[in-house]
């Protein structure tokens, strides 16, 4: 927990029952509060009380929660603050205004000159401005023909001009500048020529070939998607990827359950296994089975086939009754409870701990607390796309300020949670071209359903966030950066990642919009006394991690830094580290093998003598809700 104070907004808290066995013999298992003792005296977001009954605060929060339903959770005050900061500074910057005017005149002249050349030489004219490498909207041959080449290049000029207009204004707060630039980019993308029939030659040609039936099918697709959204059903095509039948099918057993997690132990796939087990702590923002998708791209299956005993946490998808469950509860009843179970099944052996995304952040917190207290049960720590320093946490920081967090907290206060669809919507905004407008063009204008794949089906299987946990996560990590600054408390005492001595394997992905790799790289500064192997792989936050051997167009860079080596900044590291082709999974497994002992017969499933009986087959029950 960080330094925030305790919440009095929820008097009823869910209670935790630890199910080591569901047999009558454990009927007298003592119940524990799901809210840890340390948390009851530690902090949640501080709030003002306007009166002894806090009636004024309740009214204010209810009003803001009602407004949030119409603004999709975005604070109008935060947006107005950004615009006012930008507009007032731009108004008092006559030099910047002249630069923008000059740039506009120059761009108009360039466009006019290009139009003249196109009129003379038609399609032989080379474009004078190119889209960014990740922008694939205008790469088709029809876009290179007149007049569409002028249309899309005019749009790119507008993008370029607005980028200049919204950045580089002296005096504007950096976060406000980024927010204004982001908002301008989102508005421009709405009016991109690729989104309209009259200005999209590829759509025109497709419509002629289809005789207009593409719009009929697109309308049907739109209606079908709307009906499913209203009814709470998953998107079309996800039924082909049923959990436990098509995905999450690696054989295993649930050996422990409490109100927050199920712990699975996977069956061995080899006659002998490494003595040191692997405990995986996935993110709870989405479901665990991204690491156990289809058999051909399951990381869990890959590990078991290479002689490892794998344990996986499956998080409960919380309801409103979990509103006062916080980050320390996820550590106590998630990571630590699972670790106790693993060390009971495989006693006297250190554990290879693995954390993905926010699960990796939580694992870092748990590891630092264990190191502080002399708990040496971790043999190694692997972090996948997991941030520990949130100072430069990418475009997610656009949504993180006091006004926005207060607005979001009030919305969650009313419901007790953050709905999974709202989280998914925020992520979609970060990649609106790929996840919103490209889909709109193909499925609703062209009438073509994109084939559903396992990763897309998993992405549609959203989860909720408890009010207290998500508030602490955003406020104490993103806003205050408490973990990196040494202000995070566990059991009332501060923790520091510098206490960790276990070797670390840290993975960043090049196109990660959630955990930018340069932010992930900062673990070098926070855990400088550990041996750190940093690997940078192609792909994004999800596809970069699910990178099975044999997949095309995959590459990575990897280098190990010992505690005595000098620090290299991210760009210097990338320039000096050679690139290797292929999946990074074999590199990681080789790293684990070097830190593991000689193979031995596999352990039994569960530990009945310690109370960890087999409760169900994997993938368990929590993942189904």
Residue ranges, per PLM feature:
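Alpha/beta-hydrolase-fold enzymes
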Residues: 162, 166-216, 223, 344, ...
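Short beta-strand/loop motif that positions the catalytic acidic residue
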Residues: 506-508, 512
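Gly/Ala-rich beta-loop-alpha elbow adjacent to hydrolase catalytic centers
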Residues: 355-359, 363
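Short amphipathic alpha-helix adjacent to the substrate-entry channel of hydrolases
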Residues: 292-310
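Conserved alpha/beta-hydrolase "acid-adjacent" motif
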Residues: 513-519
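Short, proline-enriched alpha-helix->beta-strand connector loops that line the catalytic pocket
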Residues: 499-504, 516, 526-530
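Amphipathic, low-complexity, repeat-rich surface-exposed segments
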Residues: 2-264, 268, 273-275, 286, ...
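Alpha/beta-hydrolase active-site loop
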Residues: 322-346
